Amino acid sequence: AHAKEMGAKPLTSPRFFLKPWAALAEPPMGCEMMLPRHLDEVHHEVELVLRLGEDATLTEIAVGLDMTDRATQDEAKAEGMPWTQSKGFANSAIVGNFIEPPVGLAHLRLELAVNGEPRQEASIGQMLFTPLDLLSSLSQWAPLEKGDLLFCGTPSGIGPLARGDHVQ
């Protein structure tokens, strides 16, 4: 749904991008997060996050925020360039508390509200590619290591954040 929302063609196979470890933030609940001052328009994208164990197996899951510098990403897309600069800034990979995954992930829901207003909501079962399909595809493309994180994509409803917004 997010790809359609962004005007992209539906994918027949997953696409991936990288975020540097320095982009990772694992803040305690209720804390304030600082966005880089030089960014004009940062969008929220709520996602399921997988943490990998030995042999690239799924060991834990969490809710995450993939923060995107939308203007820079749009420029990169138009020029056919990588998205690293738009996705890899400080605090652009915010991850909540990890838990042991339940049996089956399809019934889990992702929800995000900004200042109490619902913005994103969908079940994992509505994803174009299942989390395990993403993991399988990525493991064929790149070497995966214990501790690696895989953000699994976002539902429709992404949008900009303003300084002082409260995200739940």
Regions found by a protein language model. Give the residues of each.
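Catalytic-core "active-site belt" of small-molecule-metabolizing enzymes
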Residues: 1-145, 149, 157-168
